């Protein structure tokens, strides 16, 4: 499928600088641009590539001013990255979609399947489960008994939704993710640890995306809730009875212990760890590998273990580099003080 600069500009409400009849049929990174490809520039670090790229069309921010000749046709927009996302979504939507239930899939007789659903070979849909319209379920994905999957969802290969859990509309579950496994609940006894049955569920609201091999545990009682618009990277662990606020994003290997409430629009870097039974406010940013032992107020931007403000963290990091020299200096000072004490006592 081919589109002209004029058509693209109309769709994303952009201003054309160059040939409005330039056409593209594919996407490419700006440093790997080829004729017939559309690319984008949003990070200033990549600016040099715009003068040498072979891409036919490049999306740029409105404030971009070329310092030399640019051969590509430019389309100026408010946000080049956001406009690229719109085009990529349009591109995905234009792809032909399969529908129907493959004869090698297992679908329970009591399951309810919506319109234009595709269920791939070896997928499994349990008793009384529900699958909404236009949802795609890839090979070896499993929807447990009584679980409900909304409309326009994608369950990639080997993803698992346990019994009775709820997945909203427009959700994406990547390969190997597990929704609704038992929470890590055990009661200590003199004979060992006794398992506490986890009788709750997991609720994913609309527009949630869950990365590959990410696990969201079912509640002991009630529900573990992932609110609308949350995006979880690969290998994230959400424990039982957690609640994640709308539009919060978490990078790989974040781990959140049980019964913690995370606010809206938070951003957690990779390997952030948060203790249980805490409350994290709205719009909290945590740098990579931060360890959180206590509550955090809204609007905080922290990093480290325990987490501290960025300026304080960078100051501490500078001091940390000097610790070996400071230790030697401290030993020498102690030695000098002892020598002075001995002289004074004579």
Swiss-Prot record:
Q: How does the annotation summarize its subunit structure?
A: Homotrimer.
Q: Which UniProt keywords apply?
A: Acyltransferase, Lipid A biosynthesis, Lipid biosynthesis, Lipid metabolism, Repeat, Transferase
Q: Which residue spans traverse the membrane?
A: none
Query: In which pathway does this enzyme or protein participate?
Result: Bacterial outer membrane biogenesis; LPS lipid A biosynthesis
Query: What name is this protein filed under?
Result: UDP-3-O-acylglucosamine N-acyltransferase
InterPro entries hit by this protein:
Hexapep, LpxD, Trimer_LpxA-like_sf, UDP_GlcNAc_AcTrfase_non-rep
Q: Does the keyword Acyltransferase apply?
A: yes
Q: List the disulfide bonds.
A: none
Q: Which organism is it from?
A: Bacteroides fragilis (strain ATCC 25285 / DSM 2151 / CCUG 4856 / JCM 11019 / LMG 10263 / NCTC 9343 / Onslow / VPI 2553 / EN-2)
Please state the gene responsible for encoding this protein. Answer: lpxD
Say which enzyme class the record assigns. transferase
Entry EC no(s): 2.3.1.191
Biological role stated in the UniProt entry: Catalyzes the N-acylation of UDP-3-O-acylglucosamine using 3-hydroxyacyl-ACP as the acyl donor. Is involved in the biosynthesis of lipid A, a phosphorylated glycolipid that anchors the lipopolysaccharide to the outer membrane of the cell.
Q: Name one Pfam family in it.
A: LpxD
